[in-house]
Swiss-Prot record:
Species assigned in the record: Streptococcus pyogenes serotype M4 (strain MGAS10750)
Record-annotated Exonuclease domain positions: 427-583
Protein's name according to its UniProt entry: DNA polymerase III PolC-type
Broadest EC class assigned to this enzyme: transferase
Keyword Transferase: yes
EC nos: 2.7.7.7
Known role: Required for replicative DNA synthesis. This DNA polymerase also exhibits 3' to 5' exonuclease activity.
SMART domains: EXOIII, POLIIIAc
Keywords: Cytoplasm, DNA replication, DNA-directed DNA polymerase, Exonuclease, Hydrolase, Nuclease, Nucleotidyltransferase, Transferase
Location (main, coarse): cytoplasm
Gene that encodes it: polC
GO molecular-function term, one example from the UniProt record: DNA-directed DNA polymerase activity
Length: 1465
């Protein structure tokens, strides 16, 4: 018994008789861990044997009682030198296990504690009845039981449960007989009670009233019971139970109201053991308000009955009582000024690796009182913008960094080369076998070498080395070396000296030489022997550079490829000999193919420029110290993604050196080169490497724990020694040593989310390393990487001593943070590109067009509007944005395409005048195309100029032109005209690529980039990850827990992408690195465009962003123009035939019954959907203004349903008077008499859904003003319901395009149908479409039935839309022809009289390339056979068969018979 242990026994007054037992003979205290914050002491004891159960209980109870008096919690575990597996002792400890958490849970204890155990076949066997859930036991309880037995001193005990049939039958029999006896007794008792009751019952008239029931008293008792009730962990609930109490956090809430007016709150809670679905009913609104505390993020105590939900079929708690509880969050308890700074933290922008948003990371650090926190995501800086804004808001310094992948530019083939003829040299080709990868923690067990000259082995060296301990199973499995091999082996130092003698005057050769040489040098250093100084050739790098076309360059694949014998891979003698044979093959090829004859040439002439692609990656943390450093960081990120990307973004060391100004460099994690050197090469080597860095990082031992499992470090003591070595490295290299946390999530319980994300990557991912080989491989554990408080970090490093721990955790991290300057990540102003004379050009183009239309001098209303807009546009530097948009639109127009506008740009009259948009925002007006005389209607009586009656100019008699949609300029650039303009344009999808290239041409390729996006894991995808994790790792989660885990795993960065039409333009007097790094979308280095590294939204207020979107409408208009020769600009917006489509079908020559709809809206953009067709049927629009209203109502949120629809139905308002588009609010209120500023503000509040969110005082002020100006109450109430509104300019542009398309449907129908099917239709079924009306209607009916049963597929839903148009076309008397092998086009539908001929691409499964190939092949000659169609046309057998079935091929033979006789003619 050790003195320390004896002293402890004295303190707890352990009985002397127990102390004298043999088990206590060598008792000792291995370690005591003291957690100062939680006041927990962990004792680790060593005993000669497992303690008798009575002794164990006495020790346990006395330890607990003694320390409890000092308010200290105690836990302990035992390591026993000898273990007694007798059944009696195991049975006693088995029952004892259920007295310790977590095995003492009520359900586990009651179900399992009374079972019998035995020890058989090296296993603890639990005999259980057959109805026990074995899977649940294995998944939820077995791990805890194993850990408890290990703590008792039994070591890692294998525990299994078997079904005991005899026990099952016995318990079943007892249950049945017991139940029968109870039923019999209950019946008898009931009869006797009835007789006694009748005998005792007094006459009725003498009955006394029952005492009044005290409901308040009962409620108070229930509440008291609720307060004191035992909390049940959610994981324990497996069946229906009553009066269960949970405590946990709400993570999902949904409130519903039934038809009867009752309310139901469906919510989900978690206590982090599992999660549960719960329900709470409320009879009315008043009762519902009592449960406002049921909100997302709230911590509650709830009581209720667990029942199976009949709809979800899962266990659900019907809540009876609920109260909010205080949740004690982790806090940093260190005093102000003594708190650490976290300098290594990942956010959810670390691809598929970390969880916290940068906002939550910064908020947590600020809440804990930390003065700074660093962001160090893997190889990207996409969290910087949000981190910058959040840190400023939180009043904390954000340190901007990243964890980079550093590689050597050129990985040498030869180390320390000299001038030597390779053909005349002597080589020692060697290999070592070790017990692990760490030269400092693992041992050499074999050194073997072949000395070779001119390809011949002239001498061999082969020695085993006894490491002084048994080999692990993994080492033996990997190397084939057993303990028997090592018996009688020479001492290590003897073998090392002999090997050095063996290597004299030779070039050393090894495969992956950096490992072998590093291991040898570390051992030489340890034994005061000289390190390797002679030249070394690495055959791994030799092969990579000599044979870059090979995918694998390992020893095994290379020996197979070159047919070199390798009988026992991973035994040093065999590996060395095989490597030698390969060496001389390589030397021969290098000489013959590359002229390599001298050792010096290997590095100078053979190492490839792109050898960095194969170089081993080392992590380093890089931090921005100042503004210069920020720009350099952006350059490094860009270069790593654009120029040096290979699997991951890489930064070659010389590139880092060239951009190091303003940056600070840290050694990062266990994947850093300094840590690796400490582990594999020794402190001296690590010191040399550390000189390159600005500071050394050390991390909590828990972060390095996976290295123990991977056998890179022996144990906890080994981890602590590595940390001490790193501190020593810092001391010798004169570098600051900082303790960092390698944060990947914030709270300890969030570990499971990262586990799920990482495991979803599969075993091929580096982060998802495995232990073991083959089918037995298991995933390596992930480190405990939560955000630690200062106290927790000090506990982690307590082994260093109080002062040193405080220095590395607090003082040094604060010192480093003070060296970081504040930087501006996101600029505060807009920086537009420069175009020479942009302001003058915009003004000139505006007035030029205005004079052309309205005359010179201009009408006052036009002149004032232009002056107002130009003052804002030119004064705020927006002219270049207007001019750039005008240039792009003009170029597309010159290529023959119209460009539609989106959003509010049509609110700008200047935009109209310079040709950016067709929408004219002036009040409705007439203007004469001959003499420019004009008339404006400004009283609001007309909604659109297109609705004005036709009339001639009173001055010259020329028919007036009509225009004007009455849209205020404020809706585009804000009331003060200083909002950055967002000009969105709809280009034809066919012309979009050309428009994108126009941007490059105008501004320069080095200033134009696609707008980057970041794609994160969606909750549905995360749900799939959770289910996959369940499947792969034998887990079982209830539905609520799956939902929680999916929500926790969602939001992590998965990939990058690009906006479909967004292009960011950098000002030509700056460069892109002033704003953002750049990269390729989705890491596709073959992409033609680079994107912004930042999500474009993060910088859209700093640089010009052009939205050049592809749209079907301009494409369709161009197609119709090509077919008809009609200029779409000349199509009137008030054509009577077109307007008739909105009220009936007569203009199409069909009845509603024929086409299945009461109007002619099918296939008309904006109005062809079922939803909008329903709106048309209800409102019967007759004017362009009313169509604008419909467009606004259909695109808004809570504008039509439950709002305008009801007002129109009830006759309170009309389609004309309801609120439709956002701009109408401002115009209407101004006409009503409100001040423009207030009218604008009300419009802004309503359109953004803020009406009910602003203060009651502000809202009442607006309401009073509206009522004072006779705005009706229904209008005010309608404002309060709106969540989002559509801009009128957007609606006007879309409706105008729609009416042009509709014009062709009415007046040129076959052209319309040709364009529709060529451009808009998404799905085809040619057999049906060319089968006539009956076939089309039958298929539509079939899909309709499927839709009613929710069985229709997405393809069928798209097909139904297509068939509606086919049906209409056929009913109008046109025909749908069959696919024609010699007449059909590859892509476009063709018009042949009154018939449409479909293209090849319309055939299901036939792609564009094959379609074009068939057309090309038929131009070369007729297809003589199906075989020829397949061969020359590129059609698959399936496609040819499908064509044959449809009658397209006629009597075409299978193959060309004449070809059999070609040789005879």
């Amino acid at each position: 018994m050790s003195d320390l242990f004896a002293k402890l026994m004295d303190q707890i007054e352990m009985p002397l008789d127990m102390r004298r037992s043999s088990a206590f003979s060598s008792a000792d205290i291995i370690e005591v861990k003291v957690h100062s914050v939680s006041r927990l002491w962990e004792f680790h004891f060593a005993f000669a044997a497992v303690l008798p159960i009575a002794t164990y209980r006495e020790l346990h109870d006395r330890l607990i009682r003694t320390f409890e008096a000092a308010d200290i919690k105690v836990t302990f575990d035992i390591q026993a030198a000898q273990v007694d597996y007798s059944d009696d002792l195991l049975q006693a400890y088995y029952q004892e296990a259920f007295e310790h958490a977590p095995c003492n849970s009520a359900s586990f204890k009651s179900s399992f504690s009374k079972l019998k155990v035995t020890y058989e076949d090296d296993k603890l066997i639990i005999a259980a009845p057959g109805f026990v859930n074995n899977d649940h036991f294995r998944n939820n309880h077995l791990p805890n039981l194993v850990k408890q037995f290990e703590a008792f001193g039994f070591g890692t005990l294998t525990i299994d449960m078997v079904s005991d049939q005899e026990m099952t039958e016995h318990l079943t029999k007892d249950f049945v007989s017991s139940r029968q006896a109870l039923v019999k007794k209950a019946v008898q008792d009931n009869l006797e009670a009835q007789k006694s009751l009748e005998a005792m019952m007094p006459p009725v008239e003498e009955a006394t009233p029952a005492p009044k029931f005290d409901y308040k008293e009962r409620a108070a008792k229930r509440q008291a019971g609720f307060e004191k009730a035992t909390i049940t962990p959610m994981i324990e609930i497996e069946t229906e139970e009553n009066r269960i109490v949970f405590e946990g956090m709400v993570f999902d809430v949904e409130r519903k109201t039934t038809r009867t007016g009752r309310h139901i709150i469906n919510f989900k809670m978690t206590d982090y053991t599992s999660s549960f679905a719960l329900q709470k009913w409320a009879k009315d609104d008043e009762e519902l308000r009592k449960f406002d505390m049921i909100a997302k993020g709230a911590w509650l105590r709830v009581q209720g009955n667990i029942e199976t939900n009949p709809f979800t079929k899962s266990l659900t708690m019907n809540v009876q009582q609920v109260k909010e509880i205080v949740h004690h969050e982790r806090k940093d308890l260190m005093p102000e000024g003594q708190k650490r700074v976290e300098l290594h933290a990942h956010t959810n922008m670390s691809t598929m690796d970390a969880l916290p948003t940068v906002e939550s990371l910064i908020d947590t650090a600020a809440k804990w009182g930390h003065k700074a926190v660093a962001i160090t995501d893997h190889a990207n800086v996409q969290s910087f913008p949000h981190g910058y804004h959040r840190a400023r808001k939180a009043g904390i310094k954000a340190i901007f960094g990243l964890e980079a992948n550093i590689v050597e530019d050129k990985v040498p083939i030869s180390y320390d080369p000299v001038d030597m003829d390779l053909h005349e040299a002597t080589y020692v080709v060697f290999d070592v076998e070790t017990t692990g990868l760490s030269a400092m923690n693992n041992d050499l067990i074999q050194i073997a070498a072949s000395k070779m000259f001119k390809g011949n082995i002239v001498e061999q060296f082969d020695e085993f080395i006894d490491p002084g301990h048994p080999l692990s199973a993994f080492t033996t499995e990997l190397t084939g070396i057993t303990d028997k091999h090592l018996q009688g082996a020479k001492p290590l130092v003897t073998v090392l000296k002999a090997f050095q003698d063996f290597c004299k005057d030779s070039i050393l050769v090894a495969h992956n030489a950096s490992f072998d040489v590093g291991f040898m040098n570390a051992n030489y250093e340890r034994h005061d022997l000289p390190k390797i100084t002679q030249p070394v050739i690495d055959t791994l790098e030799f092969a990579r550079n000599l044979y870059p076309e090979y995918k694998r360059h390992g020893l095994g694949p290379l020996t197979k490829r070159f047919q070199v014998s390798l009988d026992h891979h991973h035994m040093a003698n065999y590996d060395a000999e095989a490597t030698g044979r390969l060496l001389f093959i390589f030397l021969k090829d290098a000489r013959e193919k590359h002229g390599i004859k001298n050792l010096l040439q290997l590095n100078t002439d053979l190492v490839a420029e792109d050898s960095y692609k194969k170089a081993r990656i080392k992590h380093a943390t890089i931090y921005v110290q100042n503004q210069v450093g920020l720009k350099n960081m952006f350059k490094l990120v860009s270069l790593s993604n654009i120029k040096y990307f290979e699997g991951v973004p890489r930064i070659p060391r010389t590139v880092l050196d060239a951009h190091r100004e303003g940056l600070l460099l840290g050694t990062a994690c266990s994947d850093g080169e300094v840590f690796d050197a400490v582990l594999t090469k020794g402190i001296d080597a690590a010191v040399d490497l550390a000189k390159y860095y600005d500071f050394i990082e050390i991390m909590p031992p828990a972060i390095y724990q996976p290295l123990v499992v991977r056998e890179l470090i022996k144990d906890q003591a080994g981890i602590e020694q590595v940390i001490r070595d790193l501190i020593e490295v810092g001391k010798r290299a004169n570098k600051l040593v900082l303790a960092t946390g390698n944060v990947h999530y914030l709270e300890p319980e969030e570990e499971i989310y990262r586990e799920i994300i990482v495991r979803s990557l599969g075993q091929g991912a580096m982060i998802n390393r495995t232990i073991g080989r083959g089918e037995g491989a298991q995933p390596a554990p992930l480190p405990k990487a939560h955000f630690r408080t200062t106290n927790e970090m000090l506990d982690e490093f307590a082994f260093l001593g109080k002062d040193l721990a405080y220095q590395v955790v607090v003082e040094n991290t604060q010192d480093f943070a003070d060296r970081i300057e504040e930087v501006e990540v996101v600029k505060g102003d807009l920086y537009t590109p420069y175009i020479d004379k942009a302001e003058e050009t915009v003004a000139e183009l505006t007035y030029q067009k205005a004079f052309e239309i309205y005359g010179n001098p201009l009408p006052d209303i036009i002149d004032l509007r232009i002056e107002k807009e130009l003052t804002s546009i030119l004064g705020n530097g927006f002219a270049v944005i207007y001019l750039a948009s005008q240039m792009l639109v003009n170029r597309s127009n010159e290529r023959g395409y119209l460009v539609g506008s989106r959003g509010s740009v049509g609110s700008s009259f200047v935009a109209t005048m310079i040709g950016i948009t067709e929408v004219n925002p002036m009040p409705p007006h007439y203007v004469c195309p001959s003499c420019q005389h004009s008339e404006f209607i400004t009283d609001g009586s007309v909604g659109s100029g297109y609705d004005l009656p036709n009339k001639p100019c009173p001055k010259c008699g020329t028919p007036y032109q009509k225009d004007g949609q009455d849209i205020p300029f404020e809706t585009f650039l804000g009331f003060d005209g200083d909002k950055v303009p967002d000009i969105d344009l709809n280009f034809s999808g066919d012309d979009q690529p050309s428009a994108h290239l126009d941007v490059r041409d105008i501004f320069g390729a080095e200033y134009a980039f696609r707008a980057g996006t970041v794609g994160t894991v969606a909750e549905k995808t995360a749900y799939g990850f959770v289910k996959g994790y369940e499947r792969d790792y034998g887990k079982f989660y209830r539905d609520a827990e799956v939902d929680r885990l999916a929500a926790g795993a969602a939001g992590v960065k998965r990939t990058t992408g690009q906006h479909p039409g967004g292009i960011v333009v950098i000002p030509n007097y700056m460069d892109v690195y002033d704003f953002t790094p750049v990269q390729y979308p989705a890491d596709d280095v073959t992409a033609s465009w680079q994107t912004t590294h930042f999500n474009f939204h993060d910088i859209d207020e700093n640089v010009l962003k052009l939205d050049i979107l592809g749209h079907d409408d301009p494409t369709m208009i161009r197609k119709l123009q090509d077919l008809s020769g009609i200029d779409p600009i000349t199509i009137p917006a008030d054509d009577p035939g077109v307007m008739a489509l909105f009220s009936g079908t007569e203009v199409l020559g069909v009845t509603p019954e024929q086409i299945g709809t009461p109007t002619g809206m099918l296939g008309i953009p904006e109005f062809g959907t079922n939803f909008v067709r329903g709106m048309v049927n209800e409102t019967h629009p007759t004017t362009f203004a009313e169509l604008l209203q419909l467009s606004g109502l259909s695109h808004g949120t809570d504008v039509w349903l439950g709002n305008a629809q009801d007002l129109i139905k009830e006759g309170i308002a009309t389609l004309k008077t309801v609120i439709g588009c956002r701009d109408d609010i401002m115009v209407y209120l101004m006409h009503a008499g409100l001040e423009p500023k207030m009218a604008f503000t009300i419009m802004e509040r309503v359109r953004k859904g803020l009406w009910l969110k602003i203060s009651e005082e502000e809202r009442n002020g607006y309401i009073d003003a509206m009522r004072e100006n006779n705005v009706p109450d229904w209008y005010i109430e309608s404002c309060g319901k709106i969540k989002y509104m559509f801009p009128k300019a957007h609606a006007a542009a879309y409706v105008l395009m729609a009416l042009r398309v509709a014009y062709f449907k009415v007046h040129h129908p076959i052209m319309y149908y040709c364009a529709y099917f060529s451009i808009r239709a998404k799905a085809f079924e040619l057999k049906t479409m060319s089968g006539g009306l009956d076939a089309v209607k039958a298929r539509m009916e079939d899909i309709t039935i499927k839709r009613k049963n929710n069985e229709a597929t997405n393809v069928e839903n798209d097909l139904f839309t297509t068939l509606e148009i086919v049906n209409e076309m056929l009913e109008r008397g046109f025909k749908f022809g069959k696919l024609d092998l010699y007449k059909s086009d590859a892509i476009e539908f063709q018009i042949k009289g009154d018939t449409l001929i479909p293209p090849f691409i319309a055939l299901e499964g036939l792609g564009e390339n094959v379609a074009k190939q068939i057309v090309k092949a038929r131009q070369e000659g007729e297809f003589l056979s199906k075989m020829e169609l397949r061969k020359r046309g590129g059609a698959s057998s399936t496609l040819v068969e499908k064509m044959d079935e449809m009658g397209i091929l006629g009597n075409m033979p299978e193959d060309n018979q004449l070809s059999l006789f070609d040789d005879f003619f």
